[in-house]
A protein has these predicted regions:
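Substrate-binding/catalytic cleft of secreted carbohydrate-active enzymes
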Residues: 129-131, 139-321
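Secreted/periplasmic carbohydrate-active enzymes, especially glycoside hydrolases
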Residues: 1-154, 158-162, 199, 214-215, ...
């Protein structure tokens, strides 16, 4: 377990002590000088984090000066691994902890009727995560939005994998979703490119310690897409512990860890990549105006519209087949 403590004002004789706990039991410890990463050797029988068993170790990081405790931070950590591998038929699959895992979940834009992008309470943030898990999903794609840290903590604790988008910018090249892109990449201004890289790196750094984060998604449907292969590799180099979905829905390039297709409303897999995992990143868009639950009755959205819950259920079962 790799721990970095930022203590710019630590005294020369200071040291960082790390304790990893399973309940009341200490499972690993480490000591390091301020500014030097601590490496805690986890036991061979360590407990792994997954949607079925989202185990979190308690973590205590203490700044010492001689025998005196100067400061102490309590947090948590988890042990898990996101990767891809070929199955018995040679098809590249997404994996968690070296086992194939079919990731299935909603495209979550984080809208709230009264606060738009701001949830009314922390309980509301957690409620969404809990309901997502109760409905049988094991992941959420956090679409073109970055949430407060509490939302990711709830995902850590309840066992929801997160595919995290970079919020999309305007502009971009022609969108070619049903083929590999054969056009010219969009040219951002130097200022725009610098802003993108700075903000994307800050997002990755902000969420790096959340075990729920499994996939980074720098681009969506060609919005603001530029230098795709280079951005995908830069993302992977910055954080090799997560998978990189270079462009959800295209434009498609042979880079990153997966090929991500979009097709509305019914699911369809119209491309295949033998070297990467092929996923259906978006489909559905089923809409139904539920009386008594409408914020703006004249502005309901959906790729397809139904009038009764039975119609919605039938379409959902047909699409998920």
């Amino acid at each position: 377990l790799h721990i970095e403590a930022d203590v710019p004002d630590a005294e020369p004789n200071g040291r960082i002590e790390v304790t990893v706990m399973d309940g009341e039991r200490t499972v690993a410890t480490s000591v390091a000088l301020p500014g030097v990463a601590a490496e805690a050797a986890m036991p061979a029988d360590m407990k792994l984090w997954s949607p079925d068993s989202p185990f979190l170790y308690d973590l205590r990081v203490t700044l010492k000066s001689g025998k005196e405790t100067v400061d102490e931070v309590k947090s948590y950590a988890a042990m898990r691994k996101f990767s891809t591998a070929r199955d018995a038929d040679g098809i590249v699959r997404l994996q968690l902890n070296n086992r194939d895992l079919f990731m299935f979940g909603p495209l979550d834009q984080g809208w709230w009727p009264d606060g738009l992008y701001t949830a009314p309470t922390d309980e509301a943030l957690e409620y969404d995560v809990i309901k997502t898990k109760q409905w049988g999903f094991n992941m959420i794609r956090k679409h073109v939005k970055v949430e407060p840290a509490r939302w990711y903590t709830h995902c850590d604790r309840h066992g929801i994998i997160v595919w995290q988008d970079m919020p999309s910018s305007t502009g971009g090249p022609q969108w070619q979703m049903e083929q590999y892109f054969d056009g010219a990449e969009w040219q951002r201004s130097p200022e725009s490119e610098a802003d993108f890289r700075k903000e994307w790196q800050e997002i990755m750094d902000y969420l790096y310690s959340n075990p729920c984060i499994g996939v980074w998604v720098p681009f969506n449907e060609a919005w603001g897409q530029f230098e795709t292969a280079e951005i995908a590799q830069w993302t992977k180099t910055h954080d090799p512990t997560r998978l990189v979905n270079p462009a959800s829905g295209g434009n498609h390039y042979p880079c990153g860890d997966m090929l991500d297709l979009h097709h509305y409303p019914d699911p369809e897999m119209y491309l295949y990549d033998a070297k990467r995992a092929t996923v259906l990143g978006e489909y559905g868009g089923i809409g139904m105006a539920a009386e008594g639950h409408l914020w703006e009755p004249d502005r309901n959205w959906g790729y397809v519209h139904f009038k009764t819950p039975a119609e919605v259920t039938e379409a959902y079962l047909r699409y998920t087949g």
